[in-house]
Amino acid sequence: MDYQTFEKVNKFINVEAYIFFLTQELKQQYKLSLKELLILAYFYYKNEHSISLKEIIGDILYKQSDVVKNIKSLSKKGFINKSRNEADERRIFVSVTPIQRKKIACVINELDKIIKGFNKERDYIKYQWAPKYSKEFFILFMNIMYSKDFLKYRFNLTFLDLSILYVISSRKNEILNLKDLFESIRFMYPQIVRSVNRLNNKGMLIKERSLADERIVLIKINKIQYNTIKSIFTDTSKILKPRKFFF
């Protein structure tokens, strides 16, 4: 497999893991979800007094029901205001007051400090792709969301599926077991088992019981499966270039 293609997929996996672990850190610091923080960052960096709900949904990579739900939650928490257009009540606008803007700025400034501390503590500062502050973090996050959607709609694969295929193809001359996968990727054991079963049913890997010990599940791929994985990685690597969003 082409080295650059393999490295791009590896970076994709590393960046997703970074976002996952940083999100766990943020959950301990805030009573806000990552989606709520994204909307606050949206208003902070757009720096506009009032924005239509339609525009927000168009800019943020979440389905309409998710955006509406999180805007409603942020409104209850006093970060933003939601109102209907007087001329056309079907049009909903979201606005922030000067006081709310200061409140949002405090959250974003604190987030910048957390990201800086997290990078230093986990030694992420050595990676060129690691975000230095919240704006870079959310750009990275939205690129990951875009790439996950690509996997889902183009190949009917989850990110976990891709991670497993990466580990197996990187050690294609070995016969692995579930423990090898568990030690190589961030997901929990039951999630890995379900994904392996799904990939086995789709014919993308071979799962079999060890003859020496039937409790051990062995996983391998043949040449045809390797070529299929190679094709998926090649197509995926082409869409992993950074994209510009609303920032």
UniProtKB/Swiss-Prot annotation:
| Keyword set includes DNA-binding | yes
| DNA-binding region, residue range(s) | 53-76, 178-201
- Give an example GO biological process: regulation of DNA-templated transcription
| Molecular functions (GO terms) | DNA binding; DNA-binding transcription factor activity
Please state, per the UniProt record, what induces or represses the expression of this protein: Maximally expressed during post-exponential growth phase. Repressed by SarT.
Q: Name one GO cellular component term.
A: cytoplasm
Q: Does the keyword Cytoplasm apply?
A: yes
Question: PANTHER family given for it?
Answer: ORGANIC HYDROPEROXIDE RESISTANCE TRANSCRIPTIONAL REGULATOR (PTHR33164:SF5), TRANSCRIPTIONAL REGULATOR, MARR FAMILY (PTHR33164)
By sequence similarity, the record places it as follows:
Belongs to the SarA family.
Protein name in the entry = HTH-type transcriptional regulator SarU
The organism is: Staphylococcus aureus (strain NCTC 8325 / PS 47)
Q: What is the lineage of its organism?
A: Bacteria, Bacillati, Bacillota, Bacilli, Bacillales
